[in-house]
Amino acid sequence: GVTFSAQVTAQTLRTTGTNGDLALNGGMRSNAFPQVVASPTDANQLYMVWNDKGISPSTDKSNVYFSQTTDGGTTWSPAVQVNTDAGLQDNWQPVIAITPDGTGLFVSWYDRRLDGANSRINVFGRNATISGSTVTFGTDYRITDADFPVVIGQDGVIVSTYMGDYDQAVADNTSYYRTWGDNRLSSTAHTN
């Protein structure tokens, strides 16, 4: 990056909150933390995911969204919700990866859809195929084999609850790989 183009607004966020607005159930911090991947075969195609409050007016505190550009970032498609659960459970902290041949995307996130109390956490994912400028998502699926609790009290100064700030995903031509925090063995968990 010797030079950069003019600033472009890809999406306008409603924001799920930061340290001063612990929006997710359990007092968990949740920044939008967008992630972007570039097509390895077409530099004009970029794909972005982030979490945000529900786009339409709702009480849903956090969903995962996707947008793409086919002109190098000058314009972006309208946001599409990636998680398909119908409830108001939290979905946040997405990661994204693209295959080296540029034909597949993987999006994954923390998800509470399996807990009616909106507390226990799982990791879900959704694969997509890319054909030209068209991205087609498949069905979302559970990745974790067991749910896990929120952990509190790790940072008594700024915020007591963190989850997933540094998660990542990568891909090769046959598989997707994802890291996540998993608290199922923790002794400092709580139920809300």
Feature locations, PLM:
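Extracellular, repeat-based ectodomains that mediate carbohydrate processing or recognition
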Residues: G1-N192
